Design a protein with these regions (language model features):
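Active-site beta-loop-alpha junctions enriched in small/polar residues
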Residues: 11-15, 39-43, 70-73, 99-101, ...
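Acidic/histidine-rich catalytic cores of soluble enzymes
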Residues: 35-36, 123-195
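Surface-exposed, active-site-proximal loop segments in enzymatic domains
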Residues: 74-85, 98-112
């Protein structure tokens, strides 16, 4: 039997210009949200007390944070810190969300190697019982010289990586989201949708 995604949440990065988070959390709770997705800039620099205060604020508003975006620098450079952030905030799925333009490979082999690197980066998180994957933007769907796409190569290079599919970015990349979901649906563990 196939699983169906039925739990909806709010991606807090979308509200980053409307701080403080305490007000955002209250508004989301009043709107009926139960889950939010965090992002690196909101928690990567917090100390233990700051993380606990953030968790208390979420709890006070009836919100959980089952997923979070964590930058590649933190994931590679300080996986213990990333694990602690996830533990304190209750994050069950970590998604690496972006690769700066100057760091992006130029060919299929480079993207395959990046997928392999991501899978290795994710090992401590998977070993800790968390889901680990990649969150796409549009650049992963631009055709490479060999006819493949970066997204195909990332998933091939990291065969155990999960995928947080951002549907609007797939469309912005001139790709068909239905085709991608059909081909890789079993690896999709979360989805971003926008209007």
């Amino acid at each position: 039997m196939e699983e169906t995604m039925t739990e909806l949440g709010f991606q807090l990065y979308s509200a980053r210009n409307f701080l403080p988070f305490s007000n955002i959390f209250k508004k989301l709770a009043a709107a009926g949200y139960k889950q939010v997705e965090g992002y690196g800039a909101m928690y990567a620099s917090l100390d233990e007390a700051g993380l606990k205060a953030l968790r208390e604020e979420l709890d006070a508003n009836g919100l959980s944070m089952p997923t979070g975006h964590f930058g590649l620098d933190l994931l590679e450079g300080d996986p213990e810190k990333a694990l602690n952030i996830a533990k304190v905030l209750g994050v069950k799925a970590i998604y690496c969300p972006y690769l700066m333009p100057d760091q992006r490979p130029a060919d299929a082999a480079g993207w395959f190697a990046f997928g392999k690197r991501l899978q290795e980066v994710g090992k401590p998180f998977v070993d800790a019982g968390l889901t680990f994957g990649w969150h796409n933007h549009d650049f992963e769907f631009k055709t490479l010289a060999d006819g493949s796409t970066p997204q195909e190569q990332i998933l091939a290079g990291g065969p155990d990586l999960k995928w947080e599919a951002d549907i609007a970015w797939i469309v912005r990349g001139d790709a068909d989201p239905f085709s991608w979901i059909e081909s890789y649906g079993k690896r999709i563990t979360a989805v971003h949708v926008k209007d």
